[in-house]
Structures are given as C-alpha cells and as structure tokens.
Design a protein with these regions (language model features):
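Collagen triple-helix signature
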Residues: 1-190
Length: 190
C-alpha cells in the first residue's frame, strides 16, 4: 500500500514545524511457487526440470518502505535426471525498506537430480538492508540462512549469501547459496 501523507507543519514562530513522516510502504507480495517437473516416460526417460519460483514483489515507498516479498520456493522434479527449479529472487525494498529474502531451492528426489539454487537477495532501499541470500537445495541438512547486513548511516550492507547443502541423492549436486542483496544508499535531504 502507498505511504500515508505527511502531517502539516505547525504555523507561526521563527521556524515552522516540520511535516509528519509518511506512512510505511506496504510489503511486496511473495513470489509464486515453481511447478513440479513431469515424470519420465514409463519410468525410463529423464524427468522434466522443475520451474523457477516467482520473483517477490517490490516493497512500497513511504516514510519507511515495506519489505520486499520473499521469492517463491522451487518444487521438486518427479523422476530421474530432472533438475530442480531455482528459488525466485527476493523483491527490492522501498525507500528505507529491506530487500526480501531469496526463495529456497528444492531437494532432488531421485538419482542424478540436481538440487535447486537459492534465489538472490533483494536490494535494499534508501538506507535499507540488503536481503539475505536464499538457502541452497537440501540434502540431509539445509544450508544456513545468510546473515543480514548492518545499517550504518552510510547505508545498509548487503546480506550474506546462503550456504549450499550437500545432496544425499546419488549424483545430485548441492544447491548454490543465493547472492546477498546490495545495501541501499543514504537518501538525499528533502
């Protein structure tokens, strides 16, 4: 949703009062989930790849921008040799908002099925924090979440990318961690 209008400054005096801050921007929507890959023909053919998760929506601008939506989670392919779809990228933060986290990659379900790649973290808005990178596709244990950056006055740091996990399925590679989002710049004075 759009940020609310600032309040009117006070009248009189040597210095007129400042207007009130705008309302916080609305949160971006979450990305859609990827589709499941098709089963191989008669149990012999390669399964189709899972599709990628949808991109998270962008946060609205306002007094403090809304957080970007999280990327959609990729779903698993259903047969041998079908690779997983990648997690969707996190949405970008609005002014002052955080970038959304990248979506998680899905685990391979059969031999030779590669794990999905974590989505990229969204970019921070003005003074915002970059979103954390997505988690790589899971084997027996999932990769760790990326750490969020700090918010010094010089602008927020990008989030740390998530760690890829080792796959337990035969021949399946661990998913790569998502890229950390970029820190936002300090905004100019009004």
């Amino acid at each position: 949703g759009a940020g609310g209008a600032g309040g009117k400054g006070g009248d009189g005096g040597a210095q007129a009062g400042d207007g009130g801050a705008g309302g916080a921007g609305g949160k971006g929507g979450n990305g859609g989930n990827g589709a499941t890959g098709a089963t191989g023909l008669n149990g012999l053919g390669a399964g189709a790849d899972g599709t990628d998760g949808g991109k998270g929506g962008n946060g609205g601008a306002g007094g403090g921008g809304g957080a970007g939506g999280q990327g959609g989670k990729a779903l698993a392919a259903t047969h041998q040799d079908g690779s997983m779809g990648a997690g969707g990228a996190g949405g970008n933060g609005g002014a002052g908002g955080m970038g959304g986290d990248g979506g998680n990659g899905a685990k391979g379900t059969f031999d030779n099925g590669g794990d999905g790649v974590g989505g990229n973290g969204g970019n921070g808005g003005s003074r915002g924090i970059g979103g954390a990178g997505g988690i790589g596709g899971a084997g027996s244990t999932a990769g760790a979440d990326g750490a969020r950056g700090a918010t010094p006055t010089s602008g927020g740091n990008g989030g740390t990318g998530g760690n890829g996990a080792n796959a337990t399925v035969a021949g399946g590679a661990g998913g790569a961690g998502g890229k950390g989002g970029n820190g936002g710049l300090v905004g100019n004075g009004g």
